[in-house]
Amino acid sequence: MKTIIASAILLLLTTQASAIGRIADIAVVDRQLNRTLQVHWHEGRAYVEGRPGNEYQVVVRNQAGQDVLAVVSVDGVNVVTGETAAPSQGGYVIDSWQSLDIAGWRKSLSRTAAFYFTELSDSYAARTGRPHNVGVIGAALYQIGRASCRERV
């Protein structure tokens, strides 16, 4: 059976690369098999092997002691806005020590379009003229400091 390799690249823009895993852990879960896909490292990049047609979700687990903004993209497309991905875009705020399961691109507050492993020509990004990052799962993680509220006297 032919397999498709999806590359998971973790971009930590607010901290050093050596801190990967300290702000958040990122996993890819095959929804049909109900299991986390094993990560294979090669030349500094993380890869997971997906089965064609299987839906998957991206799981972000906040490992920081404060809230984190996660700007996540799949195939070079921001999962919240649907725009071509950029680190400065909107994302999800994840409370400290909590996790978030992202099962697809946000279509509305109640609907998502599922992520699934497929051939390049069938990918959403390629069909919308953005094939350059198909197979890449990216995340820019920002620690969010809470402003303290003081009562005025």
Regions found by a protein language model. Give the residues of each.
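Sec-dependent N-terminal signal peptides
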Residues: 4-15
